[in-house]
């Protein structure tokens, strides 16, 4: 599930007791990473998509405050860039899976960004684009730098960090893509 900021805001209003008992606000893959490594973390794309600043590749104190989640800020895990950092598979999980303890585990970026990377969206020096059609339709273009990011007057879409420092993807989504085929 994405959009953690608004989800936490809803929980603050309708399920405050659950939010008060919470230790960390994980995305699904972040919870898996925690169970594999014992490290509470999220990646730059999840932090930006939740309530972050794409320029900083991290959560934004200003956005968290605007959402009214200052008291819940500690629930957001630290941001770890899986292109640079890994953590070892825990001894217990290794034993349960029949794997060697300490194998590096990498925290991946959001699926849509990884799909765009695989489709060839990353092409420095070119204004490339791609569309991903699944349950959601993502229409994306690549930006070589923060200076190339152009926010539109309608304030639609969003900007995600790419798994290469200083690069971005601007995105518009259609939340029912394959239903329209």
Question: Predicted segment positions?
Answer:
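Gly/Ser/Thr-rich active-site cleft segment
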Residues: 1-110
């Amino acid at each position: 599930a994405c959009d953690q900021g608004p989800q936490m805001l809803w929980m603050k209003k309708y399920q405050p007791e659950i939010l008060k008992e919470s230790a960390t606000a994980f995305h699904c893959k972040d919870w898996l990473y925690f169970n594999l490594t014992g490290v509470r973390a999220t990646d730059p794309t999840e932090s930006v998509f939740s309530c972050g600043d794409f320029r900083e590749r991290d959560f934004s104190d200003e956005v968290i405050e605007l959402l009214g989640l200052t008291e819940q800020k500690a629930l957001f895990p630290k941001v770890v860039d899986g292109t640079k950092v890994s953590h070892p598979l825990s001894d217990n999980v290794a034993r349960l899976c029949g794997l060697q303890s300490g194998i590096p585990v990498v925290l991946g970026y959001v699926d849509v960004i990884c799909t765009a990377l695989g489709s060839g969206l990353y092409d420095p020096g070119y204004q490339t684009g791609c569309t991903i059609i699944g349950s959601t339709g993502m229409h994306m273009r690549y930006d070589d730098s923060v200076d190339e990011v152009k926010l539109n007057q309608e304030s639609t879409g969003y900007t995600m960090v790419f798994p290469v420092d200083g690069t971005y993807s601007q995105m518009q989504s259609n939340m029912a893509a394959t239903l329209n085929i």
